[in-house]
Every structure is written in structure tokens, then in C-alpha cells.
Amino acid sequence: MYSRPSNYAPSKDVYGGEMRSQPAYSYYPEEEIQHFYRWSSPPGIIKIMSILIVVMCVGIFACVASTLPWDLDITGQSMGYGMGSGSYSGGYTGYGFGGSQMGLGFAYGGNYTDPRAAKGFILAMAAFCFIIGLVIFVMLVTRTPLSTSRKFYLIVIIVSAIIGGLVFIATIVYTVGVNPVAQASGSAFYTQIVSICNQFYSPVQTGVFVNQYLYHYCVVEPQEAIAIVLGFLIVVAFAIIIFFAVKTRKKINQYGKTNILWKKNHIYEDGDPQVEQWVKNVAENSAPALSDYNEKVDGSVADYRSANGVQAYPSQNNISHPIAEEELPLKEDYGMSPRHYSSSSDATTKKAPPKKRPGKPRRSDLDTNEGGYNTGGESADELEDDSWDSEYPPITQTKQRQEYKQEFASDLHEYKRLQAELDELSKIPVPSLNRELGQSSRKDSEEYRTVADKYNRLKEIKSSADYRNKKKRCKGLKTKLNHIKQMVSNYDK
């Protein structure tokens, strides 16, 4: 049956509002730090895209330049070959061809695109893209003050948008220029161009001379198709650069420059080097620093201690008189003689502190109360840290380090699972149940009995051996993980 605790202090009245417990790993300061030196970060992706743009520009140069000899009369002579006796005239503006003269000439008029002009346009844009991509990459790698500012990424956005649009236009013009059938489609000269180029779209008879210049004019060669594809890929790369440049500016505004790391060597100047790197190798995400499990439930510490059968506050006798000296026997497994500590040396001159859990004194308290005499008994957690030294000694070789990493990964998974189960119990509003029981006017009502059942059931769970074992196991895993992490950190120094 429900019995209301005598020393009850509702958290809302004491603290001015409900205090909810934080779940495991509810806040990590490292998550607020943006690691912009990584290749997977927004600036890193911009660097990758700039490298790809430089490579694709070189590819466009090679592909387009390989077709230029067919558009240039280097020797000053005609580059045509006879295709038979007699002569033929296409009959459309600016185009003439003579078979009996062994000559060939082109003149473009109207709305037709000169292949030489289209190739010159795309070569010029490829040169601009090459320079811009190289400049962006160099500035991001050197990490100049300008390249770490919002103004730089604004310039990148504007320049990428302009150059990307021009490259898109140049690629379209080049596609039309190297494919005369496509640009003549729908015009009055489509029939004439098709009749001239149709001979190259069907199998050529043996022994028939082929005009190579006309062949390269009518047929889109493989290197020309590759240049077209590379042109569109450059446009896509500039679009990706614009997207991540906008994202970088937003992160700079959101987190501030003080929370952004542009160089890797600034991360662990005051800490352990390479610890975060090996933790990520054994877990999905970077393992945050392990912290003590928050033992208070949804309310004050008094609520939790009352629910576990521990007196919430010291009695009047304990307040008016010094706290009795406690002797904490240690386990024989550690091979140490039992020692004790005294918490009553200054009790007559100072207000008695709240009653602490046995076996877990703070070292700072010992230093203060004992006047620097710190040879008293160690806490249970300190003894537990010492016990891991024998099972996990300092690392001396790489193979041993890898074994420690694997052990860390398996134990970390179990620790998170147990922590999640404990957090589920912490979400149950114990203070609100107490308030409902205290405010209920009729103890025989159905609502009162329901709330009382919930309270008693929660109290039984928290006082059960299974719950205590989970808490003990969770704390043991935390100590073990901290020890393994420290050993690897010492080895990596």
C-alpha cells in the first residue's frame, strides 16, 4: 500500500520548475565544433569539386584539340579529296564543293554555327574553368584569412554561378556546332545537309574515295562526344560548389568562427592526440566523453533517494551533531589492507554536509578536511580503476592496441544499451506522482489508487536487484571504457 515519504521536497517548489534528467550523452561540446579541415566537410567537398573541374578541363582540351587539324588548312592547300567526276552544288547559302577541282571550301552564313567558332568558345571556357578551379583549390588548401571568411564563399558562389552558366552555353553551342544535322533540323537547308552527310551514315562501298574533312564535319566523333559530356559535368560540379558554399556560410553564421576548426593540428593541442580517430574506427559515430550517469530521476535528488529506500535528508540529530566516523572496509580482491577515512574532523566548525553515499568520497574533500593528509581509503571507483590496470596494462605494440579497440567497441555498445534502459525509467515523472497523491482529497478514489499503484510499482523497480545490477554494470563499463581510452591515448602520444 502507498505511504507518502515523510521527508518529501517537491522539485517544482524548490527549484521553481520541473527538472528533467538528461539522457545519456544528451549534450556533447564536440558536436558544436565544425571540423572544416576534413574532406567530408563542406569546404572539403568544394576542394574535391575544384580538383575534378581542373581534371575535366584538361580532358576537354585534349578532346577538342585532337579535332582541330580538320578545321585548319595548315599547308595552305585544300584538305579535300575528289569524290568522283563532275561537280555538285548544294544550293544553300555559303556552301560550295567541287569534286573535279579536287578542292573544298566552306563559308558559313545565316544562322549556322561554325564548328571552329564553337570549338574556340568551349576551349576558352575550359581555360577559364581551369584557372578558377585551381585558384579555389589553392586558396582552400593554404587556408588564408580570406578563404576562411564568409566573403570568400560569397565570391565563390557568384563566380561559380556565372562561369557555370557560360560553360553550359558553350557546351550547347559546341554540341550544335559539331553536329550540322542537328542545327539544320527544321530549316530550309535540312534536306541538302542530310543529302550531303547521308553517305557517311551508311556503309561505305569499297574503292570509293571519302572526303575526310566532310566526314569529320558530318559525324560526331568519340572525342567530341566526350568533350560534350565533360562540359555538362563541369556545370554539375559548379552547382555542387554553389550548394556547399551556401552551406558553409550558414555554418559560419550559426556556430561562429571560434567553433570552426580549419586545421587539424589545433584540435588536440591540450588533449590526447588521435583518440577521436581510433574511436571512430570502432563505432558509427565519434564516441563522446564518458560521463557519470545522472542518478536523479525527474525531480530532485531527494525524490530518487526516497524511492530507493534511502533517507532523503539527514535527521535533526545528524544536523545538530557531527557526523559519525565511518569505516569503509575494502574488498580483499584488490590485495589492499582495509583503511578508512574520517569526515568529522571539521564538523564542529563547519556546517555538516549532506550525507554522502558510502564508499564514494571526493578526493578534494579529503584534501580540505584532512589538511593535505590524503592517505585515507580510496573510493570504490578509484579501486575499480586500479583493478583495470592489471587486466589492461599499458600498450606496447600495435596489435595490442587493435585488441583494445575491439574490446572498446563491444563494451561501448553494451554501455549505451544499459544507459538507454536506465533513461527509460528516468522519464517516469515521480515528482508529479507524489504531487497527485498529495493533492488528492479522497484516498479511496479510483484516480488515487491508480497513481498509488504507479508510484509503488516504480518504487519496486528501483529497489529491485536487477535495477541495481544494471546501474552497477553501467558504472563498471564506464570505468573500463575510460581506462581503455586512456591506455590508447598514452600509446598514441
From Swiss-Prot:
Annotated keywords: Cell junction, Cell membrane, Coiled coil, Disulfide bond, Membrane, Phosphoprotein, Tight junction, Transmembrane, Transmembrane helix
Modifications made to the protein after synthesis: Phosphorylated.
Residues forming coiled coils: 396-428
UniProt keyword annotation of Chaperone present: no
UniProt gene name: ocln
Keyword set includes Coiled coil: yes
UniProt feature, compositional bias: Acidic residues: 379-389
Chain ranges of the OCEL domain: 386-493
Main localization of the protein described in the UniProt heading: membrane
Any one GO CC term of the record: apical plasma membrane
Tissues/organs with expression: Localized at tight junctions of both epithelial and endothelial cells.
The protein's name in its UniProt record: Occludin
Biased composition (Basic residues): 352-361
Chain positions covered by the region annotation Disordered: 334-407
Subunit-structure text: Interacts in vitro with cingulin, possibly directly. Interacts with ZO-1.
Domain named MARVEL: residues: 41-250
The organism of origin for this protein: Xenopus laevis (African clawed frog)
Modified residue annotations for Phosphothreonine: T375
